[in-house]
Swiss-Prot record:
Domain of life according to the entry: Bacteria
Organism of provenance: Vibrio vulnificus (strain YJ016)
Source species taxonomy: Bacteria, Pseudomonadati, Pseudomonadota, Gammaproteobacteria, Vibrionales
GO cellular component: a single term: cytoplasm
CXXCXGXG motif repeats: 149-156, 166-173, 188-195, 202-209
Subunit field text: Homodimer.
Binding site for Zn(2+) 2: C166, C169, C188, C191
Gene3D superfamilies per the UniProt record, alphabetical: DnaJ domain, Heat shock protein DnaJ, cysteine-rich domain, Urease metallochaperone UreE, N-terminal domain
Protein name, as recorded: Chaperone protein DnaJ
Classification via Pfam families: DnaJ, DnaJ_C, DnaJ_CXXCXGXG
Compartments reported by the entry: Cytoplasm
HAMAP family: DnaJ
Name of the coding gene: dnaJ
GO biological process per UniProt: chaperone cofactor-dependent protein refolding; DNA replication; protein refolding; response to heat
Disulfide bond positions: none
Keywords per UniProt: Chaperone, Cytoplasm, DNA replication, Metal-binding, Repeat, Stress response, Zinc, Zinc-finger
Length: 381
């Protein structure tokens, strides 16, 4: 099945800004998140598709390659983005780990078949409010996992006994099969590649060396994390086979949409409504910040959509550095539910701005309509 265009997946145009791409990603990631659509394979597939598109289109080099060559740029080993959890975001090991690739579902890495396998890595999806993500927070979580059996101490053998070396493969976990002139290595059919045989298995774990348990963990989320960041808890994954090391637990962060602020990098954005009179005459308006309310001075003759930067009122990144800014967009609010007297006053005001005064009081409108008139005059001349 051919892949959909990444821009189509996110519902953005090809000239969309990084901010628009991130905004689309956050909206779709929340919609198709596995925690909100448990058991829905279609939603899980869409979540992976959205994440893959986001990872490509927010990386300048990958985006340039995709724009030029499409999906072909990442075929034949060109990135491995199909795994769904590779790339993107930041990892923080041991609580701030290294960037990892397609770890989930793997967990069995390194060594020969006869050696006990390291435990599988686990993933936990954690949803945070913007305030929690910005300030940092400690969260208690419950994780169903496999732990070493206390009764047999992870060996799988009944207490007082031990596993014996497999007589078929002599502990190698593999046997050599001859086919004509060729010798082929195959997994030992007796011990199934483990190299050991448990003749008297543990009554509790039935020879597995592990048992199911729900662990309660306290996770410290560092200040400044954002959607896509991952936190590694070393050794908190599934227990390994027959006493082998445990895997890791990766906590994947998703920040909920905020009703006031929108985050882009370390900057915050918000819209603040102002009255028509304040926009024209100037004044002060109260602006919300993560630290409380502050007053913003509004110059006279402010047009709707004008941006104001409040330095140091944004987010301090998880890796340190300067604190971001709060970008405030002023939106001039049209008055509604007017009384008769108010309507009369507005009509008087509008009439006072017409005629020769229009150029002075409404330069943009006057310039626009003069341009429209000239356009049609040129068409008919």
């Amino acid at each position: 099945m051919s892949k959909r265009d990444f821009y189509e997946v996110l519902g953005v145009s090809r000239d969309a800004s990084e901010r628009d791409i991130k905004k689309a990603y956050k909206r779709l990631a929340m919609k198709f998140h596995p925690d909100r659509n448990q058991g829905d394979e279609s939603a899980a597939d869409k979540f992976k598709e959205v994440k893959e598109a986001y990872e490509i289109l927010t990386d300048p080099q990958k985006k340039a390659a995709y724009d030029q060559y499409g999906h072909a740029a990442f075929e034949q080993g060109g990135g491995g983005f199909g795994g769904g959890f590779g790339g993107g975001g930041a990892d923080f090991g041991d609580i701030f780990g290294d960037v990892f690739g397609d770890i989930f579902g793997g967990g069995r890495r390194g060594g020969g078949h006869a050696r006990p396998q390291r435990g599988a890595d686990l993933r936990y999806n954690m949803e945070l409010s913007l305030e929690e993500a910005v300030r940092g927070v400690s969260k208690e979580i419950e994780v169903p996992t496999l732990v070493h059996c206390d009764t047999c101490e992870g060996t799988g053998a009944k207490k007082g006994t031990s596993a014996e070396t497999c007589g078929t493969c002599h502990g190698h976990g593999q046997v050599q099969m001859r086919q004509g002139f060729f010798a082929v290595q195959q997994t030992c059919p007796t011990c199934h590649g483990k190299g050991k045989i448990i003749k008297d298995p543990c009554n509790v774990c039935h020879g597995q060396g592990r048992k199911q348990k729900t662990k309660t963990l306290n996770v410290k989320i560092p200040a400044g994390v954002d959607t896509g960041d991952r936190i590694r808890l070393s050794g908190e994954g599934e227990a390994g086979e027959r006493g082998a090391p445990a895997g890791d637990l990766y906590v994947q962060v998703h920040v909920r949409e905020h009703h006031i602020f929108e985050r882009e990098g370390n900057n915050l954005y918000c819209e603040v409504p102002v009255s028509f009179a304040m926009a024209a005459l100037g004044g002060e308006v109260e602006v919300p910040t993560l630290d409380g309310r502050v007053n913003l001075k509004v110059p006279s003759e402010t047009q709707t959509g004008r941006m104001f930067r409040m330095r140091g009122k944004g987010v301090k990144g998880v890796r340190g550095g300067a604190i971001g800014d709060l970008i405030v967009k002023l939106v001039v609010e049209t008055p509604v539910n007017l009384s008769s007297r108010q309507k009369e006053l507005l009509k008087e005001f509008e009439e006072s701005c017409c005629g020769e005064a229009a150029t002075k009081h409404k330069p943009k409108s006057e310039g626009f309509f003069n341009g429209v008139k000239k356009f049609f005059d040129d068409l008919t001349s």
